[in-house]
Amino acid sequence: MAALAAAALPCLAPAQTAPEYSVVKKVPLGAPDRWDYVVFDSASGHVFVAHGDEVTVVDGTSGDIVGHVKSFPGVTHGIAVVTASNRGYTDEGEAGKAASFNLKTFAVEKHLQAAEGADAITFDPVSNHVFIMNGDAGSITVIDPKTDAAVATINVSGKLEYAVPGENGKLFVNGAAKREVISIDTATNKIVAHWPVPDCESPHGLAINGASHRLFVSCLNEKLNVVDSQSGQVIATMPIGKGSDAVVFDPKRKLLFSSNGKDGTISVIAEKDPKTYVALKPIQTTISARTMGINQATGRLFLAAADIAANTPPDRKSGRIPTQPGSLKLLFLDPAP
């Protein structure tokens, strides 16, 4: 027990040099102002930002807006890209639906039935299936991009958040309601395991380092759990900022990042080896910057944020920080050369 407790403590090493990142572009996106996931597609170099009734597509190098996918009255949340099928996927969370769209023209091709609270979406390259997390329904809709049709529904129960594909045909899903990570076999669409993360309040952000078999789970109580993706064991618990809604991993620099919208920071953690993690100096961003994508080839980070509405308290029900209408933007942050 003592050894396990020691392994779960954060490793703080002041001698470790924190990386320098700076904002190099601010791309105005404008209304709608209610936004969610930010996804970078390495094949096209495009950044997809879900906000309101549309998805805005931005060139990840120049910052030019190259297209829009719309219109979705049920509000968009997640995005997945399937290059081989020339299709992208997004959802209408409040309507319990999803849709496919053409990656070149951005025209909607087909509307698909999902379930209540359709939210995060991811593509698993092993099964070649798209997985839609129906957050409020506690289920996952499985789509075959070849036929653009649902092929299965996985009933999980409990509110779900983000998901990532893993090694050997596994899908890992944050179970926000039950403080757990769910492991799913994407060949059979069956649940393999429920792994508890008891000190993680409402798991939200999720990323993976397949090489070290590590999952990185961000929590609303200012913690990040490092979880073994093969056994489900919690390897370490690290401090992060307030309001994390996304985690990304940079395999070249062996760094993981948590975007924290409530205090306007990015927490930075170095992976020294699969058992040793070091909390570094956070990057200052702006309050509301809570979702994030990464270009793993260059290390560039992409964050959606908006200007805060002065003298307006957060929404009592959702906790969202009120923002100024039409002020949504996409921030580009680059590491120092």
Predicted feature locations:
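Bacterial N-terminal signal peptides
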Residues: 1-11
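Predominantly soluble domains enriched in secretory-pathway, periplasmic, or organellar proteins
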Residues: 11-337
